[in-house]
Amino acid sequence: MNNQRKKARSTPFNMLRRERNRVSTVQQLTKRFSLGMLQGRGPLKLFMALVALPRFLTIPPTAGILKRWGTIKKSKAINDVRGCRKEIGRMLNILNRRRRTAGVIIMLIPTVMAFHLTTRNGEPHMIVSRQEKGKSLLFKTEDGVNMCTLMAIDFGELCEDTITYKCPLLRQNEPEDIDCWCNSTSTWVTYGTRTTTGEHGREKRSVALVPHVGMGLETGTETWMSSDGAWKRACRMETWILRHPGFTIMAAILAYTIGTTHFQRGLILILQTAVAPSMTMRCIGISNRDFVEGVSGGSWVDIVLEHGSCVTTMAKNKPTLDFELIKTEATQPATLRKYCIEAKLTNTTTESRCPTQGEPSLNEEQDKRFVCKHSMVDRGWGNGCGLFGKGGIVTCAMFTCKKNMEGNIVQPENLEYTIVITPHSGEEHAVGNDTGKHGKEIKITPQSSITEAELTGYGTVTMECSPRTGLDFNEIVLLQMEDKAWLVHRQWFLDLPLPWLPGADTQGSNRIQKETLVTFKNPHAKKQDVVVLGSQEGAMHTALTGATEIQMSSGNLLFTGHLKCRLRMDKLQLKGMSYSMCTGKFQIVKEIAETQHGTIVIRVQYEGDGSPCKIPLEIMDLEKRHVLGRLITVNPIVTEKDSPVNIEAEPPFGDSYIIIGVEPGQLKLHWFKKGSSIGQMFETTMRGAKRMAILGDTAWDFGSLGGVFTSIGKALHQVFGAIYGAAFSGVSWTMKILIGVIITWIGMNSRSTSLSVSLVLVGVITLYLGAMVQADSGCVVSWKNKELKCGSGIFITDNVHTWTEQYNFQPESPSKLASAMRKAHEEGICGIRSVTRLENLMWKQITPELKHILSEIEVKLTIMTGDIKGIMQAGTRSLRPQPTELKFSWETWRKAKMVPTEPHNQTFLIDGPETAECPNTNRAWNSLEVEDYGFGVFTTNIWLKLREKEDLCCDSKVMSAASKDNRAVHDDMGYWIESALNDTWKMEKASFIEVKSCHWPKSHTLWINGGLESEMIIPKSFAGPVSQHNYRPGYYTQTAGPRHLGKLEMDFDFCEGTTVVVTEDCGNRGPSLRTTTASGKLITEWCCRSSTIPPLRIKGEDGCWYGMEIRPLKEKEENLVTSLVTA
């Protein structure tokens, strides 16, 4: 083992002397010199070269170099740089002489001011291009040369997509959590972030959108009987039974009569009550074609139109018409909101503050186009702060929407329905759904719901339609995205977490919830990245699963829905009624074709002479004894010889003969129709139930089971009315009811099944016809009993004050009336004046319903209905029908019957005394007119609708005027004015239940010519007819008669216990006077100047009065009771 100590390596210190070597090695000298140069020491020229070297190599200088650079003398540094510039110039000349590009050499020069320099809020602001990435940026400031280092990794092309933030001042410390810093003063920097491919940074995730499935929106496409449909049906049955106890009892009687066991009776009753409320269920598909047959002698019929269906109407002595609803469009929808589903961000700017320096702010925060966010971030020495801690940071970016989707509100008044009407003319394609040249196209809108269509050769048909879209537009929003549209629930639409604009905002700058499409990344010390989410179109399509898609055509939106129309046929006429029957021979052009509706189409050709003529066609049984079936094409005619004619008919089930023409040459065609009459009965009943279900609560005759019975009653009246009238003429209605009850009771207790069914049927019909009052289409005068008859209800007779009235005014729709009243109140109308006392009774009956309808939509208005005393005063304004009606549900009806509404400060006065707060000049008057006569228990319902325009005339539909032999009468439901011919026509008597302020219409006035208004006994302003029949020699207009009493009897006779003499000494004409004084004393002596005897007498509730021409002879004026009225 070698124990010898190894030689120590030479060290800079002598271990014995403990001192440094006097002479340094070459390595030590080189190292010492290099470190000194990097720390800023050494010769100036060498230092200047060392400063240029990092610029060439894009290496950041050290702190020592930067310190020396700031301390050297300016003149010496400039001289050295100029000398360097001369040397570089010589090098450029040499290179230029070599005719080669010297651009590479130029890139070696330090890039001083190679960027755009500006200021921001008084501080330097660099706008840097992509070429400066990773370089030190130098520019001169008041404190000297400022060098900024930019090490950002998201450098891109300079465009509108930029990032702006502040580079902090950093001299001694190492940079921390920053990518830009400066050595002299903090500086703003802006650079672009767009890549060479033109893409922007964005997030690919989508917003969390709630699916639309399960929102429970009725859109017209739901399946009948969903999972919870059974419970809804049970609820409807319960509420219907509570609302219609009378008809429920009748249904129970029918069920008990028909059923033989308790189970059968219960099942029949449940089925009846289940069908009855089906009018509240919507969206049940109806058959492709529906046959609606009008009542004989009726002037109108109700039909239901739906897309994809055709309705054929038939009525006696009227042409057969086909109706088809071909299009329902929504135009000019109002925009509710505009949602942004794709956006971009530009001009991102960040400002930050050190701890304890307060909250940072940006001017962009005041600009509504920007989306901003405040955060906190760690700060310290490494990012320009003197203290460590949390500092504030705010980042803003300009939000621009690239793609929108809109939510629109569809108003019912913006819906337009297109209907095609085609008469069965026998020409080709004139059967079924014809939209070609034979059809007449009309358009229906809520603003013009009444439309007339001129059918060439067949007259004019009037349609009054009421839309039934099956949609609650208060809960529906129409969402449009590019060229597609959906019906969505309003609340779901309003809750979408997307940036949106109000519909009224046309500039698009004030977008709300912009942050839902923006993601702010975790902030750095001086910078925060902001990205925008990707397009949300795909996410919206996913969320819209289950929503109903709507078709669009020419920018308009196509809807489903139903149209309930009242078809008025009074102006229709059959073409060819005056033609004679065809006597020639017919030929079958094409074999009989059976349609899917149970009808047949026969195409025949006439080969005889004498055209135009009517085609004889009958369908008979095999024995050719009984005519069966019916003609769909009413009164088929031939217009030209050898021209084919189409005839549609409905043969009975089984075998039958179709006979065309007359003998000889008569065509006899055998036909067999498959099917069952009983089955067809059930099928027709189901079709009627579906038609009921489509229309909803108020649209159809079948508004309830009572409506079903009422509709059956129309047929019963037509079939059995004449027999019933003959059998029970002169019998009171109580006796009729009693007879019906007895017959029904006997039938229910009969042991014979056939006898029991027959008696029950007869009893029920007797009960129905006895209890129900049917109305015709107007009023006529009964001369025998001196009465006005409207339908079978007698109203005005000689004994007017017994009030044996059988009429009841009803509004066409309380919800429509409430809508008109709300609009009137908004326009400053404070109340209503009734035209007749029946109208006043109607207002009293429906006031609770109107109150609840208005309270449901939170209209704070109290409706108060008062009584009528004396004259029915006139107003000067009127109610106007509105395009939309208010909601009127069964809950509202039930509350109106049971729960009073809360009073409000604002009132709407109906009748009652005139007050200063609501004078007659500010009240609506004469706004209603008779729309139709209907059915009712014990009374005839008269349905009223709102007038389209103002009118001073009384409603002519409750008036009549007639003249026969030597008698004439003008009458309505409150007046009976009778005149007689005795040498000349003159008034005999008049009865008044009320005194109206409307004008008697000329259409119901006899002998208009020749009469002066000043000579009319009953003034024109009090509904006196301007006629010679309203005249009496010696008397003038009774403008100051005692009409303040209301009920009056006017005739020509002496008041009891008084005398009247004609003398020139009599007093002047004046207000009517009562024959008794205020104390009850009878004034016996009266006179007149030139009036005829007997005098004009007026009987009121307080006694007997004389006309204005009759004056007292002796009584003092202060004792007289005078009339309070001046016309």
Curated annotation (Swiss-Prot):
GO terms for cellular component: extracellular region; host cell endoplasmic reticulum membrane; host cell nucleus; host cell perinuclear region of cytoplasm; membrane; viral envelope; viral nucleocapsid; virion membrane. The record marks 100-101, 114-115, 205-206, 280-281, 775-776 as: Cleavage. Disulfide bonds join 283-310, 340-401, 354-385, 372-396, 465-565, 582-613, 779-790, 830-918, 954-998, 1055-1104, 1066-1088. Residues 101-114 form a propeptide. One of its GO terms (biological process) is virion attachment to host cell. GO terms for molecular function: protein dimerization activity; structural molecule activity. Residues 378-391 are annotated as: Fusion peptide. It comes from the Viruses. Residues 123-238, 281-725, 774-1127 are extracellular. Residues 1-15 are annotated as: Interaction with host EXOC1. Keywords: Clathrin-mediated endocytosis of virus by host, Cleavage on pair of basic residues, Disulfide bond, Fusion of virus membrane with host endosomal membrane, Fusion of virus membrane with host membrane, Glycoprotein, Host cytoplasm, Host endoplasmic reticulum, Host membrane, Host nucleus, Host-virus interaction, Inhibition of host innate immune response by virus, Membrane, Secreted, Suppressor of RNA silencing, Transmembrane, Transmembrane helix, Viral attachment to host cell, Viral envelope protein, Viral immunoevasion, Viral nucleoprotein, Viral penetration into host cytoplasm, Virion, Virus endocytosis by host, Virus entry into host cell, Zinc. Pfam families: Flavi_capsid, Flavi_E_stem, Flavi_glycop_C, Flavi_glycoprot, Flavi_M, Flavi_NS1, Flavi_propep. SUPFAM superfamilies: E set domains, Flavivirus capsid protein C, Viral glycoprotein, central and dimerisation domains. InterPro entries: Env_glycoprot_M_flavivir, Env_glycoprot_M_sf_flavivir, Flav_gly_cen_dom_subdom1, Flavi_capsidC, Flavi_capsidC_sf, Flavi_E_Ig-like, Flavi_E_Stem/Anchor_dom, Flavi_E_Stem/Anchor_dom_sf. Glycans are attached at residues 183, 347, 433, 905, 982. The chain crosses the membrane at residues 102-122, 239-259, 266-280, 726-746, 755-773. Residues 1-101, 260-265, 747-754 are cytoplasmic. Residues 37-72 are annotated as: Hydrophobic. The transmembrane domains of the small envelope protein M and envelope protein E contain an endoplasmic reticulum retention signal. This is Genome polyprotein.
